[in-house]
Amino acid sequence: MNATLAESLWSGLAVSRVQQVLAVLVGTLALAISAHIQVPFWPVPMTMQTFVVLMIGAAFGARLGAATLVTYLIEGTIGLPVFASAAGLAGPTAGYLVGFLVAATLVGWLADRGHGRSVLTTLIAFVIGEVIMLGMGAGWLATKVGLAQALSLGVVPFLPAEGVKIALACALLPTLWRFARR
């Protein structure tokens, strides 16, 4: 049985470096697009990035998911317009960006071990990923505005939307797995 959704979709094929590079590029494109689908909050905009980050981890696994997020962070660092705000790793959202890498890698590690194939395991993996992203984001933001403000500006407003994104993933991932097994 294939460990990740990407491997399952490519089953019967030797997964080449070209396919892996293509997956990374598609993943970074999805992240860049999702960064610009936003509801403008300050200092942290609400985007679809967290959903895409977790889906990348769940679909690609730890290694390819981490490679995708490292590539994305490099793209933003060298000036490509892929981040939600121009400040990127120098601004108030830096903790979230680093949290994206950690969350995608951990969710990918869980996916490598079979999480994400059922509603329950998807829920567990994605809640862990969300805690990492919001925790690291708020931790960095707290160095700028204090812990109480970081929680009220960088966590609490996002909880309802993150819940909806997790529910969407809980419906989508097991369905994709059923499709991939055919």
Annotate each predicted stretch with a short phrase.
Residues V21-V26, F51-M55, G65-T71, T93-V98, ...:
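Hydrophobic alpha-helical transmembrane segments
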Residues M1-A59, R63-A66:
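Hydrophobic transmembrane alpha-helices
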Residues H115-R182:
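Membrane-embedded alpha-helical hairpins and interfacial helices in multi-pass inner-membrane proteins
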Residues N2-G12, Q19, V26, I33, ...:
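Short helix-perturbing small/polar motifs within transmembrane alpha-helices
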Residues G65-Y72, G79, F83, A103, ...:
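Alpha-helical transmembrane segments and their lipid-water interface positions
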Residues A14-S16, W42-T47, A87-G95, L123-I124, ...:
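Interfacial loop-to-helix junctions that mark the boundaries of transmembrane helices
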Residues A35-P45, T71-A103:
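Interfacial aromatic-anchored transmembrane helix boundaries in multi-pass membrane proteins
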Residues I33, I37, A59, I78, ...:
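Helix-loop junctions at the membrane-solvent interface of multi-pass transporters
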